[in-house]
């Protein structure tokens, strides 16, 4: 919704889910990965294309996804000395319950409503598997996976 209309409790719920959840999982994974033998591991955070180009009326969601990007970069830096690789996958328009409405049309930055293509969610899973299978000497800090015809470049 519009920024001025967002109820603070709704804002906090989005922050708790999208940011605090990622923080708590990353924090716990760091503790486990530092203590295990051999030390290290890989963390892949769930970002969003909205961290790069927001949709209209998505302040809470967009803000949390920007924050996840910052957390991912910071954790990647902090994890280096412990052989912890931290990366993020930014997903655009994967076919899920959340994107069903995209086939009827989605609000655009210019005020229009346009149908947007979606991709099979299995492509996201394949990208995550690729990231996860890299040796710890290599890290994909950020990967964007989206439908080929998704209006991302030039969206905002």
Language model feature labels by segment:
Residues 1, 28-40:
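A short helix-coil junction within the Rossmann-fold of NAD(P)-dependent oxidoreductases
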Residues 2-3, 7-12:
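Substrate-binding pocket helix/loop in short-chain dehydrogenase/reductase
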Residues 4, 53-59, 116:
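Active-site loop immediately N-terminal to the catalytic Tyr-X3-Lys motif
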Residues 26, 64:
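Active-site helix of classical SDR
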Residues 31, 77-80:
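Alpha-helical segment proximal to the catalytic Tyr-Lys
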Residues 48:
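Residue(s) in the substrate-gating loop at a strand-loop-helix junction
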Residues 88-89, 107-154:
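C-terminal helical subdomain
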């Amino acid at each position: 919704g519009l920024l001025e209309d967002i109820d603070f409790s709704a804002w906090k719920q989005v922050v708790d889910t999208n940011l605090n959840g990622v923080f708590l999982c990353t924090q716990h994974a760091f503790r486990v990965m530092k203590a295990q033998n051999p030390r290290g591991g890989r963390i892949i955070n769930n970002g969003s294309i909205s961290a790069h180009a927001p949709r209209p009326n998505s302040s809470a969601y967009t803000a949390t996804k920007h924050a996840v990007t910052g957390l991912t970069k910071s954790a990647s830096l902090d994890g280096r000395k412990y052989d912890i690789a931290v990366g993020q996958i930014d997903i655009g328009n994967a076919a899920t319950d959340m994107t069903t409405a995209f086939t009827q049309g989605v609000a655009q930055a210019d005020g229009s409503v346009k149908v947007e293509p979606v991709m099979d969610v299995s492509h996201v899973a394949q990208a995550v598997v690729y990231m996860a299978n890299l040796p710890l000497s290599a890290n994909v800090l950020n990967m964007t996976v989206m439908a080929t015809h998704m209006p991302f470049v030039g969206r905002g």
